[in-house]
């Protein structure tokens, strides 16, 4: 399976940076150059707590996402360069449900559905990626490189949630609940884990011929 993406990472010529923050998270970027060495590093933090609080379910939501990426280069000889690309991503999700209430039906036949819940869910997803490349420029039109990369992923999902259902007629104007139509209970449990490790070593070559590039 091939990709049409051709990503080129920038090399800063001096010190640069930026940062921003909001109710949904924050991000920062810094780049620098000191002759033979350059680096660009970015950091992002996101949270969806305020967005998820608008759902029908009364619960404690605490999802957060952290992403760190860096790209470093070092030219140790006129035609030789070594670079490193690294990425770390950590996603956490915590959910403690309390109640859920939904009304549906028509004006003359309105129903109310309630769920009283207990328990919690905790999920965690971590990925770590690193790639080291040794690059040699034979001339202006020819480039050779040796790459080694590693990827590891860790996914954990666990929850123990119980719910008591109640279905009844919605309250009439000026009155109380009329009738309980149905009562039920459910339990959900899960312990899912997935760990994976992938390593790769490869060699590449690039030849530029007028308006064409051969890889």
Write out the residue ranges for each language-model feature.
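Short loop/turn positions at the edges of beta-strands in beta-sheet-rich folds
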Residues: 11-13, 22, 76, 138
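Periplasmic-side early beta-strands and strand-to-turn transitions of outer-membrane beta-barrels
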Residues: 35-123, 159
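Face-selective signature of the C-terminal outer-membrane beta-barrel domain
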Residues: 75, 79-90, 120-215
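Residues that define the transmembrane beta-barrel architecture of outer-membrane proteins
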Residues: 22-26, 33, 64-66, 124-128, ...
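N-terminal periplasmic accessory domains that precede
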Residues: 1-16, 28
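Transmembrane beta-strands of outer-membrane beta-barrel pores
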Residues: 9, 23-25, 34-36, 45-49, ...
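Well-ordered beta-strand positions enriched in small/hydrophobic/aromatic, beta-favoring residues
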Residues: 5, 17-19, 41, 146
């Amino acid at each position: 399976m091939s990709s049409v993406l051709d990503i080129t990472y920038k090399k800063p010529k001096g010190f640069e940076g930026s940062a921003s923050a909001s109710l949904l998270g924050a991000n920062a970027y810094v780049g620098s150059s000191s002759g033979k060495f350059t680096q660009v590093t970015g950091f992002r933090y996101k949270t969806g707590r305020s967005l998820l609080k608008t759902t029908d379910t009364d619960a404690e939501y605490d999802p957060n996402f952290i992403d760190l990426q860096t790209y470093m280069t070092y030219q140790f000889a006129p035609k030789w360069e070594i670079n490193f690309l690294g990425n770390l991503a950590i996603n956490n999700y915590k959910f403690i449900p309390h109640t859920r209430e939904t009304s549906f039906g028509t004006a003359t036949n309105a129903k109310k559905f309630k769920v009283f819940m207990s328990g919690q869910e905790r999920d965690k997803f971590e990925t770590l990626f690193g790639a080291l490349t040794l690059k040699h420029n034979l001339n202006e039109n020819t480039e050779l490189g040796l790459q080694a990369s590693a990827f590891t992923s860790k996914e954990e999902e666990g929850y123990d949630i119980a719910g008591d259902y109640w279905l009844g007629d919605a309250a009439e104007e000026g009155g109380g609940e009329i009738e309980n139509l149905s009562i039920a209970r459910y339990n959900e449990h899960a312990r899912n884990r997935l760990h994976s490790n992938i390593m790769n070593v490869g060699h590449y070559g690039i030849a530029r011929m007028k308006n064409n590039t051969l890889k």
